[in-house]
Amino acid sequence: MDEGHVIVIGGGLAGISAALACSDAGRKVTLIEARSHLGGRVSSVKHPRQDWQLDNCQHACFRVYDRFLQLMGRANAQQSIKLQANTHLPFALPEKKVFSALTTGRLSPPNHMMGSMLSFPFLSMRDKLAMRKAVKALSSMDNQQMWQLDDTLFIDWLRQNGQTERAIDRFWAFFVLAALNISIQEASAAQACMLFKNGLFGAADAFDVGAFTSDLSDSIEPALSSALEQAGVKIIRNSTVKAVVIENNVFTSVKLKDEILQCSDVIFATPHHITARILENSVTKSEIPVLEEMGSKIDKLCTDIGRIEYRSLIGIHSFYRGNRVPKDFTFAVMVDQPLIQMVFNRNSELSSPIEEGVQWVTVPVSAADE
């Protein structure tokens, strides 16, 4: 065992953050990533016929993502994100040519969007008046009360708090789908309440939208790699962890294809099915008769992890000669559209176009399994 050595498995944002935190705490850290690049799902792929880097999906962030923005600051990558000066969330019903936006006004939270909400054409006055009860309940909720709702469906909580079906469909459901990547019929009330309490109805600038000014592989990966190296973190790319070794309830080593790394702690920052696979292959050793008990605990953990489900997120990229949407169009939520939930003009976000005369329009499809 290498005392004090932390091995982080997985080079996505969670793994990178964990590695930096451990290094800052004075620990020796090794980060292992199976692919050739860091960033996990926050990455890009090459267009099959053009020399363009395309993000695997349309990504955005919000000012309330303070830990993510802190990570970008740590990596000196702030310039890769363009944040709105004031919250502006456009909604559209194209077939009826109705467009409107929720914007920040002069009132203090949670009422800072009340002015634009009063003129919001997609909800009736009855819908809007009913929303006051839910907003009041969210504002008075503390964290303990929030997490006690984990086994409650958010749609049931909304109905219990007087929300109309139209408000659920045209307001609450969109934010749940976009932020949690799950339908409102399945979403935990605890998770959704946290989203609205800390986000939309939190600080006045919490939902200022942030867009990436270049492809993710260019804007994030080099900066994060540099930050890790400067912190003294050893990075191992293109290497898959096969198993971990546990002795007397302590992680002592990690097995790669051609080498074994000694350690005293392991952090899993991997998709849950990969975590389960590594643990299933783990080796347990003990000088006291708890080997069977330890193995049983790992088996149960793998079974529990295996119950966790995924929800897919698909990115649709369209390229046009000339403009299909106005040049000053940024993005909009598509009301009453189950598939085309949002439309983004990627040109409005980029620091320079991918090609002169080409307009890039993207559509993220959340909870695409459905």
PLM feature spans:
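N-terminal Rossmann-like FAD-binding beta1-loop-alpha1 element of flavoenzymes
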Residues: G4-L31
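Short loop/edge segments at beta-strand edges and connector loops
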Residues: G10, A85, R237-S239
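Conserved Rossmann-like nucleotide-cofactor binding loop
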Residues: A14, H37, H273
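Glycine-rich FAD pyrophosphate-binding loop
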Residues: S23-P48
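Conserved FAD-binding subdomain of flavin-dependent enzymes
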Residues: H37, V45, R49-L83, N143
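Mobile amphipathic helical/loop "lid" adjacent to a hydrophobic cofactor/ligand pocket
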Residues: F68-L69, G73-R74, Q78-A189
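Mid-domain catalytic core of redox enzymes
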Residues: T87, T240-E370
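Helical element adjacent to the flavin cofactor pocket in flavoenzyme catalytic cores
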Residues: M194-K257, L261, D265, A269
